[in-house]
C-alpha cells in the first residue's frame, strides 16, 4: 500500500519518517513528496582508464574509479551546473531522508524534465527500509541541448510503500551497507562488493 498525502504528513508528524528539511505542504502531493536538487555534483573526468572491468579485483576497480571520477563540485545558491548531451553526472538531493524498517521509498524523476531529455536516476530508484542519508541522483542528458541545473530546483518525487511487516534486514543493520548515512554526491563504491 502506498502512502497518500495525509498519511505522509502523519508519518512525518509522528517522526516515523523524516525528511530534513521538512517539505512544505505545497510539496506534498496526492502520493508523493517533491524533492529538490542539492549543491554537490561529481562528473567523470578524462579517460585515463580505457575501461572499467567490473569483475576485476577490488584494487583494480578502485584504481580505475580514482582515475575517472572528479572531486566534489559544490555550487553556491545561484550557480548553475550544465549537463551536456550524452553526459552522466552524480548529484545529491537537498533533503536527507530516514526511512523506517517497515517502509520502502521510490524515487521518480519529474516528467517535465524527462521531456527535455533529463534522466534523474539511471537505474537505482528504490530506497531501502532502514535507509538514512541524502539520495544520490544519477543524471544523464539524453537530449540535444545542454541542461542548466541549479541547487534548490524541484528534481523529482518520493513515494512510500508500506511493507507487510518490519524488514528483518533493514539497510542500517547490514554489514555491507555501502551508502548508509550518505552525505553528498558519493561516487560508486562497487569496489566494496
From Swiss-Prot:
Binding of dCTP, residues: 110-115, 128, 136-138, 171, 178, 182
Keyword Hydrolase in annotation: yes
Active site: 138
Domain of life (superkingdom): Bacteria
Pathway in which the depicted protein is active: Pyrimidine metabolism; dUMP biosynthesis; dUMP from dCTP (dUTP route): step 1/2
One GO BP: nucleobase-containing small molecule interconversion
Disulfide bridges in this chain: none
Sequence segments annotated as region (Disordered): 171-193
Catalytic activity as recorded in UniProt: dCTP + H2O + H(+) = dUTP + NH4(+)
Record-linked InterPro entries: dCTP_deaminase, dUTPase-like_sf, dUTPase_trimeric
EC number(s) stated in the UniProt entry for this protein: 3.5.4.13
GO molecular function, one term: dCTP deaminase activity
Keywords: Hydrolase, Nucleotide metabolism, Nucleotide-binding
Subunit comment: Homotrimer.
Sequence similarity: Belongs to the dCTP deaminase family.
HAMAP family found in the cross-reference section: dCTP_deaminase (MF_00146)
Protein role: Catalyzes the deamination of dCTP to dUTP.
Name of this chain's protein: dCTP deaminase
Organism per entry: Hamiltonella defensa subsp. Acyrthosiphon pisum (strain 5AT)
Upper lineage: Bacteria, Pseudomonadati, Pseudomonadota, Gammaproteobacteria, Enterobacterales
Amino acid at each position: 500500500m502506498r502512502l497518500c498525502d495525509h498519511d505522509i504528513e502523519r508519518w512525518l508528524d509522528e517522526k516515523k519518517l523524516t525528511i530534513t528539511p521538512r517539505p512544505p505542504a505545497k510539496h506534498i502531493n496526492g502520493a508523493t513528496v517533491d524533492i529538490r536538487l542539492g549543491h554537490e555534483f561529481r562528473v567523470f573526468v578524462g579517460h585515463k582508464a580505457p575501461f572499467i572491468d567490473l569483475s576485476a579485483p577490488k584494487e583494480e576497480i578502485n584504481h580505475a574509479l580514482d582515475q575517472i571520477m572528479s572531486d566534489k563540485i559544490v555550487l553556491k545558491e545561484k550557480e548553475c551546473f550544465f549537463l551536456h548531451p550524452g553526459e552522466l553526472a552524480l548529484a545529491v538531493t537537498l533533503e536527507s531522508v530516514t526511512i523506517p524498517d517497515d517502509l520502502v521509498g521510490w524515487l521518480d524523476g519529474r516528467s517535465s524534465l524527462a521531456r527535455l531529455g533529463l534522466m534523474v536516476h539511471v537505474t537505482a530508484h528504490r530506497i531501502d527500509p532502514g535507509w538514512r542519508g541524502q539520495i544520490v541522483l544519477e543524471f544523464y542528458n539524453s537530449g540535444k541541448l545542454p541542461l542548466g541545473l541549479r541547487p534548490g530546483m524541484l528534481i523529482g518525487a518520493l513515494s512510500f510503500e508500506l511493507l507487510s511487516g518490519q524488514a528483518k534486514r533493514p539497510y542500517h543493520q547490514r554489514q555491507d551497507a555501502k551508502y548508509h548515512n550518505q552525505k553528498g554526491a558519493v561516487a560508486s563504491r562497487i569496489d566494496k562488493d
